[in-house]
Amino acid sequence: MNKALRQKKIRELVENNDVSGQQELLGMLEKEGFSVAQPTLSRDFAEMGIVRNRTADGGYRLSVPEEPQEDILRGLVGMEVLSITANETSIIINTLPGRAHGVGSFLDRINSPEILGTIAGDDTVLVIPATIRKISSVKSYIQKILSQP
């Protein structure tokens, strides 16, 4: 099952229904044709920032943070990047010490079809593009989303 599609459905269900918890959401997902294990749903909640809030009547309701939070996160991640360089096969992002994992994770969560994945060390992220023919455009895309010159 496609993670992005699953998370899109989770967002839709949580935003459009009064969902009180994970078990209720698991049932709703099942009715929509998504077979999801509880640990997977927990990871999705963490990645998406879904929280459980108390309602006025004393119950609980799941909620998804607004999208502008993504813009704030993008700005913060961008401040951790020192440089972005590329050769004919890969892209390297140099970060502040200890920040490479966060930058790599941010890029992975974007789910861009142009990026196969990232490998992060302490202060360096290796970006693996979907094709080496588009290295320049992938580098430009990363610079744009991280607001780098």
UniProtKB/Swiss-Prot annotation:
Which UniProt key words apply to this protein?
A: Amino-acid biosynthesis, Arginine biosynthesis, Cytoplasm, DNA-binding, Repressor, Transcription, Transcription regulation
Q: Which GO terms describe its molecular function?
A: arginine binding; DNA binding; DNA-binding transcription factor activity
SUPFAM superfamilies listed in its UniProt record: C-terminal domain of arginine repressor, Winged helix' DNA-binding domain
> Where does it primarily localize?
cytoplasm
List the GO biological process terms: L-arginine biosynthetic process; protein complex oligomerization; regulation of arginine biosynthetic process
List where in the cell it is found. Answer: Cytoplasm
TM spans (from-to): none
Q: Which InterPro entries match?
A: Arg_repress, Arg_repress_C, Arg_repress_C_sf, Arg_repress_DNA-bd, WH-like_DNA-bd_sf, WH_DNA-bd_sf
Q: In which pathway does it act?
A: Amino-acid biosynthesis; L-arginine biosynthesis [regulation]
Q: Which GO terms describe its cellular component?
A: cytoplasm
Disulfide-bonded cysteine pairs: these are none
Q: Which family does it belong to?
A: Belongs to the ArgR family.
Q: What does this protein do?
A: Regulates arginine biosynthesis genes.
Protein name per the record: Arginine repressor
**Organism this protein belongs to:** Chlorobaculum parvum (strain DSM 263 / NCIMB 8327)
